[in-house]
A protein has these predicted regions:
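General beta-strand structural signal in soluble alpha/beta enzymes
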Residues: 36-39, 63-66, 106-110, 137, ...
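Extreme N-terminal starter segment of soluble prokaryotic enzymes
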Residues: 1-7, 33-34
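Conserved catalytic-core segment of NTP-binding enzymes
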Residues: 14, 30, 43, 111-195
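Switch II (G3) loop of P-loop NTPases
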Residues: 92, 96-120
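Generic beta-sheet signal
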Residues: 4-8, 104-108, 135
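Glycine-rich phosphate-binding P-loop
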Residues: 7-21
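N-terminal phosphate/diphosphate-binding loop that engages ATP/GTP or pyrophosphate donors
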Residues: 19-86, 90, 95-98
């Protein structure tokens, strides 16, 4: 049976994708599932990859989780070009399918925002179109998030996805809008499954 793939994407960088991905992977593993984690692209260090690895007790080579790692803290496309490297969608999908073949559940974490360029002429929506995955959109529960989430949902729906999870990650110091954002998103996007989590660090 093919693995269930949970593709965790974000409205932006630094919104809590890694924290949520690690939490989801840990929960799935605790429930007895054979879980793999993967973050194909990472720029500016591998701290996020290490957190993912720890969530499932992985102690092997991080290249097996994160094959496309770059030094420069910019979008993966720009970072790859700065190192004279080219990453194609075929390269990416070959990696994703290989990891998925070894798991019951794969928690796949994207990089940056939903439309951030990952490689030559592709982004996270192209990966979603190439695999059967449940997209989970992560965003910070702060002012402006309603617009960001609705724009991202519109793009995901345009790509053919109608069952989308949305997770709003709490801020260390909650903002005034934090108490109403979930309700407004549910009202404006009734088909999305919207959840909120408290501040979890990161």
């Amino acid at each position: 049976m093919p693995a269930r793939i949970f593709f965790v994407v974000g409205t932006d960088t630094g919104v809590g994708k890694t924290v949520f991905s690690a939490l989801l992977a840990y929960h799935l593993k605790r429930s007895g599932r054979r879980v793999k984690v993967a973050k194909p692209f990472c720029s500016g260090g591998r701290e996020d990859v290490t957190i993912l690895a720890q969530s499932v007790g992985f102690e092997g080579n991080l290249d097996l989780i994160n094959p496309f790692s770059f030094a420069l803290p910019v979008s993966p496309l720009v970072a790859a070009r700065s190192e004279g490297r080219v990453v194609s969608l075929d390269d990416t999908m070959g990696f994703v399918r290989s990891v998925a073949s070894e798991a019951e559940d794969l928690v796949l974490e994207g990089a940056g925002g939903l439309l951030s360029p990952l490689g030559e002429c592709f982004d996270s929506t192209d990966i979603l179109e190439a695999i059967e995955a449940d997209p989970i959109l992560v965003a910070k529960n702060r002012i402006g998030v309603v617009n960001q989430v609705l724009l991202s949902l519109r793009e995901l729906e345009r790509s053919g996805h109608t069952s989308i999870g949305v997770v709003l990650m709490g801020e260390e110091i909650p903002e005034e809008s934090g108490s109403s954002n979930v309700g407004v998103i549910r009202e404006c996007a009734p088909t999305a499954r919207v959840f909120e989590l408290p501040y979890l660090g990161g």
